[in-house]
Amino acid sequence: MAKLKWYKGNIHTHTTESDGDDTPERVVGWYRRHNYDFLVLSDHNHLTLLDYGSGRRRFKSPLMVPGEEVSANIKGGSVPIHINGIGISRVVEPIDADDVVATIQANVNAIIQAGGIASINHPNFHWAFDHEALMQVTGASLLEVYNGHPKTNIYGGPGKPSNDEIWDAVLTSGRPIFGVATDDSHNYLDWSPTKSNPGRGWVVVRAEELSVDAIVDGLATGSFYSSTGIALSELDVTPSSIELRIQDDGETVHWTTFTGKGGRTLLEVVGQDAQYEIKGDEGYVRATVRASTGARAWTQPVFLGD
């Protein structure tokens, strides 16, 4: 068996093929210069392919994983239902079923039929839907717990759950789904906190090799962690424990929260190393790492029987 390696990538990216402000080639160049191993160009309702037309790779790096943001805007356009299809083999036309749950489910199904995995994007964008809807959806592999677009309301608000709370509610309902951090990048020419710039959120996939199949499989099986700036030097997840080590610069303070069913805090650990021994009655266990800089990282849940 080949040794597993870690590969960093962004799975939510826009170009001038939809509503981004720079060309696909220049966008890919930005991620190459910043040492990303793989990239999904996820233009709205468009499959932006730079590698596959000639049957050979156009760029040495990053690896291009085919994708699309399947975008249905229902109820007169006021409710955006946007779902990334990752690893798809063809364009997926959005389906507008008018009802939120039916629209999500129809587009998830269409992505799977196109050979991809489905990532539910920014549920709090325009307050489109929350855990109540997602509890009724089957087949989705991923959910954005962090989205770098400044208007996606990831932290929620009065009476509105945060993306983390939505994730915990869906997990508590028994729906297995993995949490991703993404850029949702649109702006490469103008940089400010009010713009959707690259480099804000990413996933780090553990795989045997850097290939489309290996990366998509790693995402589908939860063999990754998500981050907005924290790097893990070690991550060991087994049915009996979660152990991690944070890359430390000697100044930043880190703390890790282990979370179980119902969003319950199981343990909080301050420092570079954190470990949780699984008891078996937690429902699931996942870890969130926080830094004094404001950066975060998320491990994927270990699912436990009743």
Placement of each model-derived feature along the sequence:
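C-terminal functional module detector
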Residues: M1-W6, P24, S173-F178, D183-D306
